[in-house]
Amino acid sequence: MGAALGTGTRLAPWPGRACGALPRWTPTAPAQGCHSKPGPARPVPLKKRGYDVTRNPHLNKGMAFTLEERLQLGIHGLIPPCFLSQDVQLLRIMRYYERQQSDLDKYIILMTLQDRNEKLFYRVLTSDVEKFMPIVYTPTVGLACQHYGLTFRRPRGLFITIHDKGHLATMLNSWPEDNIKAVVVTDGERILGLGDLGCYGMGIPVGKLALYTACGGVNPQQCLPVLLDVGTNNEELLRDPLYIGLKHQRVHGKAYDDLLDEFMQAVTDKFGINCLIQFEDFANANAFRLLNKYRNKYCMFNDDIQGTASVAVAGILAALRITKNKLSNHVFVFQGAGEAAMGIAHLLVMALEKEGVPKAEATRKIWMVDSKGLIVKGRSHLNHEKEMFAQDHPEVNSLEEVVRLVKPTAIIGVAAIAGAFTEQILRDMASFHERPIIFALSNPTSKAECTAEKCYRVTEGRGIFASGSPFKSVTLEDGKTFIPGQGNNAYVFPGVALGVIAGGIRHIPDEIFLLTAEQIAQEVSEQHLSQGRLYPPLSTIRDVSLRIAIKVLDYAYKHNLASYYPEPKDKEAFVRSLVYTPDYDSFTLDSYTWPKEAMNVQTV
């Protein structure tokens, strides 16, 4: 722990500083980002021995165990007689990884490593976040979820079913860790843009929490992935003999709501009222109402609504430095009116209000197109969210017509309709404005509204492009090269989570997501903008997440949202002291000796 924080930084000891969870860092060391070179590993006492050590991914070091550790832990002979540093272990993994032909095979290798040696897994991820993020999360995680029956190797996370209702507290007691600080939960009904994958959706919470640690430094032993299995309406899965979930239609209504209510209460009863619960990939009908139902009662947020909103608004704020005007000068057309679209729209309204625009005027700057066309006043069966953005305008059937009529400065695709941004739409956008904003945010890549290459080619390099999934750099005929910005939620949720955990925040207001968007936009340099980037390089994401966490923590104390007191004087030092390190611990016994005269053997 950082000495500058001292004893009594809190009224009670910080919960969950498990052995091996802290980086070897001191506040007096020179600032070197999130990855200052660690000092010697301190000995960590273990009660486990033998196979209980080598088969525990939190403890296993493979051939990095020293001879002394092997002898003391009773594992000598259970490991080959070879001694490797973590650097060499990383090299072995990388060489094997590079031999794989498919991304799915690479995903399986990494997940198998996570099940075997957790520290090495995170050493691999943090060695090149930009390289490995598309494998452990979008777009490859979508493919892994579709084939989860084949890729499933070892249970990771907690599977809770509708038939366990009334016994969720008992099920949570089955989890081996008691000091959980973050839960990511899904019911598998709307996995990315792939639809209802039921129990196969567990790949999403597992992947998200891997990024909590790799990008945000949250201790993985304090994270819990949860799949709520209430059935699936995917007939293909119901017929599949390899499907690992409940084989019946989805349960809705009161029984579903009762399960969610019990789950939320059981989590907070077990892990505390400030345990963070992130909702992920719930269907639109449930996502909004559950967010509104729980947001002021529990420490929770919905990443598809609020996380996506934050990263999208961050990209828009960065784009303003290219268009050289204010947010209030822009008009937005959305392809899609689901969770992501509504989340972005609401945060845009908040940003416009902060700029001084009245709310009614701000909503008129946002036009939404769903499967039935432009959302207009008087249209039947509009839900509350859509009514807020319904325009006083005659009905318009297609996105192309809406773009032609409205002449927006920005189009944002979040409907998972591949190719929705046609060449005609892109040409129109380029004719209306010198620097049109074009965000194709749908995941995975196969569902993107347009490719980066198509956007830059049709707009002759004038389009300001961002996507939800990664695209390679694009070089036009004139030799100009663009590096597309990826609006990945991983810029948001790891840093927000670290800040929320650090402050013991009990409720997460939308202001935190606007603050996060502003911080991400500030991280983009002029050089990045000249390359077409609207987001900082993924290689810097751990440092970005750290600064977001510090901002969140500072905001929490200023607005009386934090529950841990006294307030840390040096918030950066405090947050850094919580960051997980993949460096191995030492498991040798604490050995020392007494003065010789004190050990004289008494005789008769």
From Swiss-Prot:
Region (Disordered): 29-50
Modification type Phosphoserine: residues: S371
Tissue: Expressed predominantly in organs with a low-division rate.
Keyword Metal-binding carried by entry: yes
GO MF annotation, one: NAD binding
Family: Belongs to the malic enzymes family.
Active site, UniProt feature: Y137 (proton donor), K208 (proton acceptor)
Protein name, entry field: NADP-dependent malic enzyme, mitochondrial
Cofactor note: Divalent metal cations. Prefers magnesium or manganese.
Reactions performed catalytically: (S)-malate + NADP(+) = pyruvate + CO2 + NADPH; oxaloacetate + H(+) = pyruvate + CO2
Organism: Homo sapiens
Underlying gene: ME3
GO annotation, biological process: aerobic respiration; malate metabolic process; oxygen metabolic process; pyruvate metabolic process
Enzyme Commission number, as recorded: 1.1.1.40
InterPro entries per the UniProt record, alphabetical: Aminoacid_DH-like_N_sf (IPR046346), Malic_enzyme_CS (IPR015884), Malic_N_dom (IPR012301), Malic_N_dom_sf (IPR037062), Malic_NAD-bd (IPR012302), Malic_OxRdtase (IPR001891), NAD(P)-bd_dom_sf (IPR036291)
PANTHER family: MALIC ENZYME-RELATED, NADP-DEPENDENT MALIC ENZYME, MITOCHONDRIAL
Alphabetic keyword roster: Metal-binding, Mitochondrion, NADP, Oxidoreductase, Phosphoprotein, Transit peptide
Cofactor(s) needed for function: Mg(2+); Mn(2+)
